[in-house]
């Protein structure tokens, strides 16, 4: 089974009574009080409040998914400021390096917004290059939507829907290439998979690197009678655009 700790910003937990996040303490209590839960997954972490204590706890806890969802939205400093995000490109880069150093083999996910008012072609290209360079394991992209009542609604430099769509497509193309490279590393490897659905050819499941509904799947080809909700070891035999294909380890040659 899997327990998801989810919120728009779970690193804000406890900040109504303290000057710093209490998420690490909460996670420690959950680990100690849920011995029958196979995976514990955190969704989502504010880049400004990811502590060393939290990262070390994730790294040291076998049942906590080595999965960090870090919604950065953009990487250009001017756009970040316009979005009212008090963090810089250098700080984001440093945090990503720290996460990957502290949690070896971590799955790193982010979400981005393209077409924010006044985003120039140069600023957008900076974002594309960042996606190519950092190689997020998982990535979601949203097209900026002008919503009445928001601060950005009145911003000058609103971008046409055509350009916003073009930018969305460019980011997705860049990430498809990254995803192909990321998935290729799993060929021949054996990973833990949580079985979720029976299919004609076998089962659908998820790896530790795949959050429910937003990430990829693992197609498990088998004629065995396996139990939904259980974990099995799967040897990866093929890759799809965002998904993996494999078979139970005891069936592999």
Predicted regions mapped to residue ranges:
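Terminal RNA-binding accessory module
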Residues: 154-253
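Conserved, mostly hydrophobic/aromatic
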Residues: 5, 42, 70, 111, ...
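Short beta-alpha junctions and helix-cap segments that line functional grooves
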Residues: 54-55, 127, 220
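Proteins enriched for Cys/Gly/acidic motifs involved in redox and nucleic-acid/cofactor modification
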Residues: 1-13, 68, 90-97, 101, ...
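Active-site proximal loops enriched in glycine and acidic residues that flank catalytic Cys/His/Asp
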Residues: 7, 44, 72-74, 110-114, ...
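Radical SAM enzyme [4Fe-4S]-AdoMet core and its adjacent flexible, acidic
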Residues: 14-36, 82-83, 146-177
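Conserved SAM/AdoMet-binding glycine-rich loop
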Residues: 1-121
